[in-house]
Amino acid sequence: MSGRGFLLLALLLLVTVEATKVEKKHSGFLLAWSGPRNRFVRFGRRDMQSPLLSERLRL
């Protein structure tokens, strides 16, 4: 895996985990934080709607 691809994956994972943490307080947090990066918004929404994936990321 290239360094850039790994960095992007790590950033995506971090954003997803952070979004899961604040999900109950700020449901639109990831959407507002991402701005023009629609890819992150899509992944974040899908992860938020999937309790199993969210639990797996927390472990």
Swiss-Prot record:
A cellular-component GO term for this protein: extracellular region
Residue numbers of Phenylalanine amide PTMs: 43
Tissue: Expressed by the venom duct.
Keyword Transferase included in the entry's annotation: no
Keywords: Amidation, Cleavage on pair of basic residues, G-protein coupled receptor impairing toxin, Neurotoxin, Secreted, Signal, Toxin
Top-level taxonomic group: Eukaryota
Record region (Positively charged region crucial for activity against MRGPRX1 receptors): 32-39
Cleaved propeptide residues: 20-25, 45-59
Subcellular location, record wording: Secreted
UniProt main location, coarse: secreted
UniProt signal peptide: 1-19
Molecular function GO labels: toxin activity
Membrane-spanning segments: none
Function: This peptide activates human and mouse sensory neuron-specific G-protein coupled receptors MRGPRX1. The activity on human receptors has been measured (EC(50)=1.8 uM). Compared with the agonist chloroquine (anti-malaria drug), it is 200-fold more potent. The peptide also causes an increase in cytosolic calcium in a specific subset of DRG neurons, and, in contrast to other Conus venom peptides, the peptide also affects a large fraction of the non-neuronal cells.
Note: The mature peptide does not contain cysteine residue.
Entry's family note: Belongs to the FARP (FMRFamide related peptide) family.
Protein name as catalogued: Conorfamide-Vc1
